[in-house]
Design a protein with these regions (language model features):
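Active-site-adjacent mobile loop/cap segments within catalytic or ligand-binding domains
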Residues: 1-54
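Short, glycine/serine-rich, charged loops/turns that create anion-binding
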Residues: 19, 86, 166-169
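Short, solvent-exposed loop/turn elements at domain surfaces
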Residues: 23-25, 90-91, 169-175
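Pro/Thr/Ser/Gly-rich low-complexity, intrinsically disordered linker/stalk tracts
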Residues: 52-92, 142-157
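Recognizes extended acidic, P/S/T-rich segments that occur
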Residues: 93-127
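Beta-strand-rich modules
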Residues: 124-140
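Low-complexity, Pro/Ser/Thr- and charge-rich linker/hinge segments at domain boundaries
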Residues: 151-171
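Conserved small/polar residues in nucleotide/adenosyl-binding loops
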Residues: 181-187
Length: 188
């Protein structure tokens, strides 16, 4: 059985992950965070297998950055900052640099600017909306992009407005667990 998996000339993986008869498994299967973790584990497994087949070292793609923020700085500039995320299970996944993508007004994002440190000080023209997203990079590749943040300095500004994105919940649809009621109250 499973001849393809037993012949070493063909890379094969049999993955039995979730049971459609287990409700808890189905909740995991709907959770985007779980899907990301499983996909990353499969990617790492394939990378390690191919690396061992050819006797070559490997470097795992870094994780996306977090805590992206943009604030006004002196001289009509903006400071874009973020924090790298380390993969506690994979030391090779540490970022060696970052790519900051910029969009002006409703245009498309540019091809990105490489930086070594988790910050970028950039000039902004008044009255234009500047949007930023960041990826982490290393020899293994480029991470998924961060969320997008934006800043706009008006020429006749009367103050500064700070917008805080406190929404970071990404999950499956809500699943409510109820107690089984055995009361005869409905029959009364």
């Amino acid at each position: 059985a499973y001849y393809e998996a037993r012949v070493p000339g063909v890379p094969t993986m049999l993955l039995e992950l979730l049971s459609h008869q287990n409700f808890a498994d189905m909740r995991y299967g709907s959770d985007p965070r779980f899907k990301f973790l499983v996909s990353r584990a499969v990617y790492k497994g394939i990378l390690r297998y191919i690396s061992s087949q050819y006797g070559l070292p490997y470097v795992v793609q870094p994780l996306p950055v977090e805590s992206l923020a943009v604030q006004f700085a002196e001289g009509g500039k903006a400071a874009v900052t973020w924090s790298p995320v380390m993969d506690s299970l994979e030391t090779t996944a540490a970022p060696t640099g970052y790519v900051v993508y910029t969009r002006i007004d409703d245009g498309g994002f540019d091809n990105g600017r490489y930086v070594d440190n988790p910050c970028l000080l950039t000039a902004q023209e008044p009255g234009r909306i500047y949007s930023y997203k960041v990826t982490a990079v290393n020899e293994g590749g480029e991470s998924f992009p961060s969320e997008t943040v934006a800043a706009c300095r008006m020429p006749d500004e009367k103050g500064t407005v700070l917008i805080v994105n406190g929404f970071d919940r990404v999950s499956a649809p809500l699943s409510v667990r109820c107690l089984l009621y055995t009361s005869d109250a409905a029959d009364e």
